[in-house]
Every structure is written in structure tokens, then in C-alpha cells.
């Protein structure tokens, strides 16, 4: 496989009626944190909109080996995610005919944190993930395969529950993904697929557009995709994690679709199935980038140091598009610390680095992992007590908050 391939049909409804929505220029891979002098390759980063089902997808899909074999994102570093994982296990127990010893497969199990909570609840835990650097962590207490998920790699075992959290959108062939899931489901099995940024368009968010995220689903596009398989989309829930996420419930048997129908009507009322909504979204994205640059310039002139918090992939997209250089970025993930950000070459430091600033230094904090804003703010305030510090937020519009 070459480094990337063109996606010329809608991945959900298979239509060729797709048009460019946003072009974020060529950018390096968002999670390619590197040593200071390393030169990175850039790849096309743009999204098309399907004019039939309103699915948003990348124009090009990068070879997954370049993205996931050595993966520096770990899910167990934030309390917000851990709390959501605990909630999710309880949700699954209540939503299924759970009995102790039920089997669960976590597709893209990362460092195994979600599986840890399933194991605590009495599930037999299985995982699969291609990240070779995380295998020792994920396989410590669980049955884990270090590979990509497909019907060949997972074998013939059938599972009671299958979980795909924030991995389904990474796949450039989601229909094949669903077909592979069907082969390892029995009649009562439940597949839960979580996709992030359910309110991306309504809140003018664009920073989650990076090469790992091939697709940006709405309820209609997911429904059209599932209809092309032997499975059934039976319910949809919205959860607050990752800036509001969809949690899709998919089964072999067709059951009540009331929740699904309600969400379809809700999104239609919001304008998500109207081309005018996406024209406005495009204009708002441009305005946010220009306003962000203006705010940054004003604070630099006023003598503020510019400190990002959370070297999240979404932040890399934002900074590269805005072409803004910060003084440093703080991140609590040890795997990223002392490396440099892709494209902007900003050094990543641990939280303790903040103590090197004097008490009367003025800092402008930009929480790049804005989906963990409250947690980030709390960590900063525990480290610094300076009333002149300011927090900059940029969705759904650019604005500041005082300490």
C-alpha cells in the first residue's frame, strides 16, 4: 500500500456525489511527535461532504501502519476518560442481559484501561490493537492480539459484547469492519460503536480533522451504512465525552428503533441534513482561525507567555492551520514529554515545568485538549496562583476567561 489513497465515494452510502467541504492544506501526521531536528512528511488534509447522507470524510486515507503501529496516545492518562469508562461498563451491564463471565471484545483497546473496568465488573476480557508499543500494557491482564481488527485476525470466537470506541472513524472501509463484527456475534450479541464530535458542525469544530479520523458520522450517515450490512442500528445515545459523542447500538436482531428515529428528527431540525448549514460552518471555521491569530498577537504584545496545555492531536491540526507558534505545550503523558510537535515544532513539557515561571509572569493558557478543559484548568490552578493568568477558548467562538 502507498502512503495514502484517494477516497472518491461516500464510505457510508457509497454515493459518488461528494464535494470538498474544508481544505486544511498538507499537514504532518498529528501524533508524530518527534526529536527537535527531525523532518516530517506532510499529507493532504481535507474533507468532503456527501450530498446524499451528509457524511463527512477525508479526501485521502493515510496508510494505517504510519498512524497506529507506534501510538503515543494512551487513554488512561485523564480522569475524565476513566470516569467515562466506568460509566460505560455500568451502561453496558444495564443495557444487555449481562451475567458474570460474559465476554467482551474491545477493538483498539489501546493501553487496556477500558478492559480493566470490564474485568472488575466480571467480564471475560479480550482486546485487539495494532500498537506494538502498548501491547505490554494492554495484554498484562487481558487476552490481547497485537494486530488490526478484521475477520482473519480475530478468529472464530463469538462475543457477547463488542466495543469500538473512537476506532470506527479511523477505518477507511467501515462496511468491511461491520461485516467482520457480524461474523463474531451471536443472535443476542450487542455491538457498541462510539464516534466523537457529534456536535462538530454545530459548534464550528474542525480540529478533530486529522489523518487518523477518516470519518465524521451523523445519525443518518451511520444508519445508511448499517443498512448496507446484515446488522441493524437500533438505538443512539449522546454522551458528553470528547466534545459530545454518539454511542450507536447495533444488533443482529431488529428491535425497537424509537431512539434512532428521534435522533434523526432532531438532527434534521438542527439543519444537519441541509447544505446551507455546511456553508455557514465553512465561514465560521475561517473566522475562528483569523480571530485566534488576533487574540494571540494581542497577548504577545501585552507581554504574555503562550502556553498550550494538552499536546492532543486536535491541537496539532489547529496550530498548523492557524500557523501559530507557542512558547511550550504542557502534557501529562510521559510518552510525549520533551518531544516536539509536528509541523509547529513546539517543545512538550511536563506540568512541573510551569513552576519555572515566576509568580508575576503573565501566562496565556490555551487548552488544546479542550474536551478536558475543566480538568486542565483545575491542574493549572493547583500549580499556579497568579490572578493575571488568562485562559483562551476557541470553540464555538474565540474568547478568554480570567483565572
Predicted regions and their residues:
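N-terminal juxtadomain amphipathic helix
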Residues: 2-80, 237
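A conserved beta-strand element that flanks and buttresses the S-adenosyl-L-methionine
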Residues: 163
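Conserved beta-strand signature within the Rossmann-like core of class I S-adenosyl-L-methionine
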Residues: 188-196, 390-393
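Short, glycine-/aromatic-enriched active-site segment of Class I SAM-dependent methyltransferases
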Residues: 193-215, 219-221
Amino acid at each position: 500500500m502507498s502512503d495514502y489513497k484517494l477516497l472518491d465515494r461516500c464510505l457510508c452510502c457509497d454515493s459518488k456525489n461528494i464535494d470538498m467541504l474544508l481544505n486544511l492544506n498538507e499537514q504532518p501526521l498529528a501524533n508524530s511527535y518527534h526529536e527537535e531536528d527531525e523532518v516530517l512528511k506532510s499529507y493532504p488534509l481535507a474533507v468532503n461532504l456527501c450530498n446524499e447522507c451528509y457524511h463527512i470524510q477525508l479526501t485521502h486515507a493515510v496508510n494505517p501502519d504510519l498512524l497506529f503501529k507506534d501510538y503515543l496516545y494512551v487513554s488512561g492518562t485523564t480522569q475524565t476518560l476513566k470516569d467515562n469508562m466506568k460509566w460505560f461498563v455500568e451502561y453496558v451491564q444495564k443495557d444487555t442481559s449481562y451475567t458474570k463471565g460474559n465476554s467482551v471484545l474491545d477493538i483498539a483497546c489501546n493501553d487496556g484501561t477500558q478492559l480493566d473496568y470490564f474485568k472488575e465488573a466480571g467480564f471475560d476480557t479480550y482486546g485487539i490493537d495494532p500498537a506494538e508499543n502498548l501491547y505490554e500494557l494492554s495484554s498484562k491482564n487481558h487476552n490481547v492480539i497485537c494486530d488490526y481488527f478484521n475477520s482473519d485476525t480475530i478468529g472464530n470466537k463469538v462475543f457477547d459484547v463488542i466495543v469500538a470506541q473512537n476506532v470506527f472513524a479511523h477505518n477507511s472501509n467501515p462496511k468491511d469492519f461491520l461485516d467482520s463484527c457480524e461474523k463474531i456475534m451471536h443472535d443476542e450479541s450487542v455491538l457498541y460503536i462510539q464516534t466523537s464530535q457529534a456536535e462538530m458542525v454545530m459548534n464550528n469544530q474542525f480540529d478533530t480533522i486529522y489523518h487518523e479520523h477518516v470519518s465524521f458520522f451523523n445519525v443518518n450517515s451511520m444508519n445508511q451504512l448499517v443498512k448496507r450490512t446484515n446488522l441493524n442500528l437500533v438505538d443512539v445515545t449522546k454522551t458528553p465525552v470528547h466534545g459530545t459523542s454518539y454511542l450507536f447500538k447495533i444488533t443482529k436482531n431488529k428491535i425497537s428503533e424509537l431512539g434512532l428515529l428521534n435522533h434523526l428528527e432532531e438532527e434534521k431540525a438542527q439543519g444537519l441534513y441541509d447544505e446551507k448549514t455546511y456553508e455557514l460552518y465553512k465561514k465560521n471555521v475561517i473566522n475562528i482561525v483569523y480571530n485566534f491569530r488576533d487574540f494571540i498577537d494581542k497577548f504577545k504584545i501585552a507581554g504574555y507567555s503562550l502556553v498550550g496545555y494538552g499536546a492532543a492531536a486536535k491541537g496539532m491540526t489547529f496550530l498548523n492551520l492557524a500557523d501559530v507558534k507557542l512558547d511550550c505545550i504542557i502534557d501529562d503523558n510521559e510518552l510525549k514529554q520533551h518531544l516536539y510537535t509536528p509541523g509547529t515544532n513546539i517543545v512538550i513539557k511536563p506540568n512541573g515545568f510551569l513552576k519555572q515561571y515566576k509568580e508575576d509572569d503573565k501566562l496565556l493558557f490555551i487548552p488544546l485538549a479542550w474536551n478536558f478543559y475543566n480538568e486542565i484548568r483545575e491542574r493549572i490552578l493547583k500549580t499556579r496562583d497568579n490572578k493575571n493568568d488568562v485562559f483562551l477558548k476557541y470553540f464555538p467562538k474565540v474568547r478568554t476567561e480570567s483565572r
